[in-house]
């Protein structure tokens, strides 16, 4: 398939995990990919797998960083067709242990960064009739124990998607999100490498395992494609069925 031939796609948090997997999928389908992250070495490694990929090392949580990303993309390719807001951090802590610096960092990158990137890319997306895909989380659909800042940020992302999707009548820009659960990434290594904790997680996931990054990246590519042309304002769980449960334990 070449669903993205000639399309310019920005992916934040592209140095590893879901972002890197999505970037490779877009590259396989003919896209002109702009890889964004804070660590150039990681981005360069991903770029080796994607012909013609551009690398921009910048912080999406700052206005200067966002300006460099959007200006660099326009200079290289002349437009923006898809924005994938994937950058994110997580610093687990309960209320009494949540420090202000950790709270501010999480909200700045996970939520303010989404706003800044989307606002800066918006005129170009309107011009191209493009779309935005966010990486939210099942943690944006409900609460987790000891994940206050992350839950707040991802809940904000999910509602940002729904509110912005309502502007499609004037903008022509579709806005959607994926909501992964446990995924085999660097950020989730503390979960998937802890046999006891991961075992508890697998008991709650009907498909019995964490997702591979490629399984989430493939859904991002679907939402960004013409195949999803009438999909707007959706928070699509990619969680193996975790969110299908109402929380009750098995009764049989």
Predicted regions and their residues:
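Alpha-helical segment proximal to the catalytic Tyr-Lys
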Residues: 123, 166-170, 229
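Substrate-binding pocket helix/loop in short-chain dehydrogenase/reductase
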Residues: 94-95, 102-104, 201
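Short, small/polar-rich loop/turn modules that mediate ligand/substrate recognition or access, typified
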Residues: 84, 169, 174, 231-233
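Residue(s) in the substrate-gating loop at a strand-loop-helix junction
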Residues: 137
């Amino acid at each position: 398939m070449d669903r993205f031939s000639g399309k310019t796609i920005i992916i934040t948090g592209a140095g590893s995990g879901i972002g890197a997997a999505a970037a490779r999928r877009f590259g396989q389908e003919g896209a002109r990919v702009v890889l964004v992250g804070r660590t150039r070495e990681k981005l360069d490694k991903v770029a080796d797998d994607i012909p013609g990929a551009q690398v921009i090392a910048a912080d999406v949580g700052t206005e200067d960083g966002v300006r460099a990303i959007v200006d660099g993309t326009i200079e290289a390719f002349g437009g923006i067709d898809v924005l994938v807001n994937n950058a994110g951090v997580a610093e687990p802590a309960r209320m009494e242990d949540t420090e202000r610096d950790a709270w501010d960092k999480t909200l700045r990158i996970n939520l303010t960064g989404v706003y800044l990137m989307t606002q800066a890319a918006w005129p170009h997306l309107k011009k191209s009739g493009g779309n935005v895909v966010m990486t939210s989380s099942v943690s944006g659909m409900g609460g987790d124990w000891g994940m206050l800042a992350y839950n707040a940020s991802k809940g904000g992302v999910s509602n940002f998607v729904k509110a912005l999707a309502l502007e499609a009548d004037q903008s022509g820009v579709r806005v959607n999100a994926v909501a992964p659960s446990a995924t085999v990434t660097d950020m989730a290594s503390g979960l998937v490498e802890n046999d006891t904790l991961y075992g508890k997680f697998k008991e709650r996931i009907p498909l019995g395992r964490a997702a591979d990054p490629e399984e989430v990246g493939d859904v991002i590519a679907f939402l960004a494609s013409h195949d999803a042309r009438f999909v707007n304002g959706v928070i699509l769980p990619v969680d193996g069925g975790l969110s299908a449960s109402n929380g009750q334990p098995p009764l049989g």
